Structure formats: C-alpha cells, structure tokens
C-alpha cells in the first residue's frame, strides 16, 4: 500500500541555493504525493513540451515552418499546463499558513516568511503566451514561456531568504517547509507520513534537533527515523523526549 514519507536532510539547503528547477521538482513531488491527476497532467505536459521543442529544432534545421503542425502541440500544452498552474497556485496558498506557523515556533523570532509562486501564467493565459512568443521560440528552438519556467520565491520580511537570511533562519525555514508538507499529507490522506531525519546533526546543533523532534512528537506526526554516525548523540536527543525508541 501507499506509505507517504518526508525526509529532512542537509541537501534541503539546495532548495534555497539552487535555481528554480530544484524548487519546481520539490513542488511537483509534494503535490504528486497526494494527487495522481496532477502527476498524470505533469507527465503529459513534459511529453508534449519535448515534442514541441523537437519540432522547433526540426524547423530551424530544415529551414522550414508549418504553423498547423506546431499548433497540434499548442493545444495539449495549454490544456495540461493551465491545470498544473491552477493546482500549484492552490497548493502554495493552502500550505503557506502552515509554513508560517511552524517557522514561528521553530525560530522563536518575529520574522515573517512567505512563499510566492512565480509563473508566466500570472501575467497572461497560456494560449496568448505561446502566440506572443512564437518568433522567439523559433529563434531559440525551444518553448520559452510556460509552467516549466515556474519558480518559488522564498522571502523573509520581504527579502530573499537566499540573500538576507542567516544560516539559522534558512534552516528553520526549510524545516518549517517540510513539516508543513507532512501536515498537508496527513490532512489529505488521513495517514501519518514517516519522517526521515537524515544526518541532520550535520546542519543543526543538538538543541535544535531536540526542538525539532519534540515539535514533531507534539504534533503526533507518527514514526521518526533518524540516521547519524554518532550513536551516543542520537540516544541523548531521543532520551530528552521520553518516547519509545529503538537504536540500530
């Protein structure tokens, strides 16, 4: 059966430091965990996008152009892309208050964090975007506008967390993001996801790890698996919350 899981690891920092592709993949993975229709639309969109781009390359290579052939792909790209856009928009709106709630608890600070969903479709509908950028797409030989260019903007007090957030603030934000993901999965599936804490001592001090485990325990998120190279350190942290545990 389906057993949802969420991992918190040092590699989560890439969600802040890397480009938009890593954040898109993360957003897609979060939504797809509980929405099979979204996953289907995403697969169809990516497949059609590849075909449209291949046709644009063919046109340039052979110095030809056929608008009717291109529009065969425009219709499904518009259809699937618009559905994906709407679901991404709704998901970010739904999860944001939970992210803010957990960030306040974890950071014990007064900073206001927010997540802004950036998309070309915020400016115009997909059909118009394809029409307006046709010549540009022909020159570039790929589709320059669409939901495959979307991004999530992580802000703290109106500024980019990537540029203005301290290491501690960035860590707190990422943990809040993952905990919000867990809560969202639980709300939709009525199942407790397994939480995997992978080598978190690498980026968090012992007190912050204890706070995290206590918070998760209070929220009744279910089973927690912790990986660490120092057995004694893990035992010390687990003992603080007085919960049943097993060390392997």
Regions found by a protein language model. Give the residues of each.
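Walker B catalytic acidic pair
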Residues: 198-200
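Secondary-structure edge/capping motif, primarily at the C-terminal ends of alpha-helices
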Residues: 56-63
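Hydrophobic "anchor" residues on beta-strands that sit immediately upstream
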Residues: 5, 194-195
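H-loop (His-switch) and adjacent beta-strand-loop-beta switch element
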Residues: 241-248
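Conserved NTPase motor "head" modules and their coupling/switch loops across ABC/AAA+ ATPases, GTPases
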Residues: 64-194, 203, 207-223, 232-241
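Conserved nucleotide-binding/hydrolysis micro-motifs of P-loop NTPases
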Residues: 12-13, 21-22, 120-122, 230-233
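Extended, charged alpha-helical "arm/stalk" segments used for dimerization and assembly
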Residues: 1-55
């Amino acid at each position: 059966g389906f057993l949802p899981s969420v991992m918190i690891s040092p590699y989560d920092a890439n969600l802040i430091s890397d480009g938009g592709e890593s954040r898109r993949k993360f957003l897609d993975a979060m939504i797809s965990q509980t929405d099979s229709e979204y996953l289907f639309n995403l697969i169809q969109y990516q497949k059609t996008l590849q075909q449209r781009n291949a046709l644009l390359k063919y046109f340039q290579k052979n110095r030809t152009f056929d608008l009717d052939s291109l529009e065969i792909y425009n219709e499904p790209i518009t259809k699937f892309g618009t559905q994906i856009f709407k679901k991404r928009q709704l998901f970010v709106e739904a999860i944001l208050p939970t992210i803010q709630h957990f960030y306040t608890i974890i950071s014990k600070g007064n900073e206001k964090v927010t997540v802004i969903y950036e998309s070309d479709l915020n400016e115009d509908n997909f059909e118009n975007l394809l029409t307006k950028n046709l010549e540009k797409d022909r020159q570039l030989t790929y589709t320059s506008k669409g939901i495959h260019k979307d991004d999530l903007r992580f802000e703290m007090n109106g500024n980019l967390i990537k540029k203005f957030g301290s290491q501690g603030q960035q860590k707190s934000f990422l943990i809040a993001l993952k905990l919000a993901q867990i809560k969202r999965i639980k709300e939709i599936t009525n199942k407790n996801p397994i939480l995997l804490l992978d080598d978190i001592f690498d980026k968090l001090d012992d007190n912050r790890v204890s706070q995290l485990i206590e918070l998760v325990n209070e929220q009744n998120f279910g089973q927690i698996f912790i990986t660490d190279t120092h057995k004694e350190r893990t035992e010390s942290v687990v003992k603080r919350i007085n919960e049943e545990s097993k060390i392997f």
